[in-house]
A protein has these predicted regions:
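N-terminal strand-loop element at the rim of the active site
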Residues: 5-70, 234-238, 364
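Aromatic "clamp/platform" in nucleotide-sugar-dependent glycosyltransferases that forms part
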Residues: 89, 259, 278
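Short hydrophobic beta-strand element within catalytic cores of glycosyltransferases
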Residues: 35-37, 286, 295-300, 305
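A conserved mid-protein helix/loop that constitutes part of the nucleotide-sugar donor-binding site
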Residues: 13-21, 195, 199-218, 239-240
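Active-site donor-binding acidic/aromatic loop of nucleotide-activated sugar
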Residues: 237-240, 251-260, 266
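A short, active-site helix/loop in glycosyltransferases that binds the activated sugar's phosphate group
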Residues: 136-176
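A short helix/loop element that forms part of the nucleotide-sugar donor recognition site in Leloir-type
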Residues: 176-190, 243
Length: 367
């Protein structure tokens, strides 16, 4: 079976992690992925090629619409794909869905990975295109969570059972707590026995780094030994956050760690995970943090479907004061980590175990 994956970029964020987690497993089951990318460079390029995937670079649809359409049609014609799987952060661009449907692809999937989007123009396009998606994809609606499904496909179709939840599953072994990794990372950055508050996320408005810094300043009043470890690629907010850290003399307490491939090691170095996002589909970062045994203090905008283990998530309203957030973070940091057996049980029961979920996705592709 050959599947064309659309929607991956060069960031290496949650969407890309979703596809690669499944690809690593499905490639062992005679399911091969190819990829269309319009961003000049795709994340995980080397690994994709190692697994046997082909990468097709196309013009950016916003800058060269006709060139995008022409190249995409060529790819579909030569590829003879069983499935075209379009991963979407919004419905602003439905061109690949339309082209795949017109080309006669047996199964064209629209997959919602988000629950909102920035910008008035994009929001307008999203709402205009929602109805068109239903005509193109018929019954092949995927979403990472209920809130993501309702946002892209609407309440009527979700309540009618037309949306399939495909979970953001992970390989537990990649994220399990390691005392050795904790010691190595803490030594490398000079953290010693300090109180490490961690966050993983691209520097975009959605992740609310401004609010995160407000909370961290209150944490310092209660735990002067605290440090903030920020893991994530540079986005539109990076320079603003960097400048604020400098202007508020927090440079020795806030660490910009960049995009990492060894996320499990950095999670092991943390004492608590802080995630005050403005909105999310279903964040991989929270599944990974829970797999490491961390207690996570999160915004209540995030779907409870991400709760792997009861009691491990501590949700708070974004309207709650930074001081109250800080109190919750400090308390959460005192809780012991969850053990391996409980984590595994939670991942399996919550449908976050990649081995099981990959088999399910293969079956969905074949239906």
């Amino acid at each position: 079976m050959r599947v064309l994956q659309v929607g991956l970029g060069n960031i290496g964020g949650g969407l890309e992690a979703f596809v690669m987690n499944y690809y690593r497993e499905l490639s062992k089951m005679d399911v091969q992925f190819d990829f269309v990318c319009m961003y000049g460079k795709i994340a995980y390029e080397k690994e994709i090629k190692t697994l046997g995937g082909r990468i097709f670079y196309v013009p950016n649809v916003k800058k060269n619409y006709l060139g995008y359409v022409k190249r995409f049609k060529q790819i579909l014609k030569k590829g003879n794909y069983d499935v075209v799987h379009v991963n979407m952060l919004s419905a602003a661009n439905i061109v690949p869905l339309r082209l795949a449907s017109k080309a006669g692809v047996r199964k064209v999937i629209a997959h919602s990975h988000n629950s909102s989007c920035p910008g008035m123009v994009r929001k307008f396009m999203h709402w205009c295109n929602r109805a068109r998606i239903k005509k193109i994809c018929h019954r092949f609606f995927f979403a990472c969570s209920e809130v993501a499904g309702r946002w892209l496909f609407g309440n009527e179709d979700y309540d009618a059972g037309k949306v399939v939840i495909v979970h953001n599953a992970i390989s537990m072994e990649r994220y399990l707590f390691s005392e050795d990794h904790r010691a190595i990372v803490r030594s490398a950055f000079g953290w010693g026995n300090r109180f490490v508050v961690g966050h993983v996320g691209r520097f975009d408005p959605q992740k609310n780094h401004e609010g995160l810094l407000d909370i961290f300043k209150e944490i310092l009043k209660k735990r002067p030994d605290a440090v903030l470890a920020l893991v994530g690629s540079r986005g539109g907010q990076y320079e603003n956050i960097l400048e604020r850290v400098k202007s508020e003399n927090l440079e020795d307490k806030v660490f910009f760690l960049g995009k990492r491939t060894d996320i499990g090691a950095f999670l092991s170095a943390m004492d608590v995970f802080l995630f005050p996002s403005l909105y999310e589909g279903l964040p991989f970062a929270l599944v990974e943090a829970q797999a490491n045994g961390l207690t996570c203090v999160i915004s209540d905008t995030i779907s409870r479907e991400v709760n792997v283990i009861p009691g491990q998530l501590k949700p708070l309203s974004l309207g709650t004061s930074p001081e109250k957030w800080a109190e919750t973070v400090v308390r959460a940091g005192k809780r012991p980590r969850v053990g391996k057996e409980e984590i595994y049980q939670g991942l399996v029961e919550g449908h976050f175990d990649i081995c099981r979920e990959a088999r399910r996705l293969k079956k969905l592709y074949g239906e």
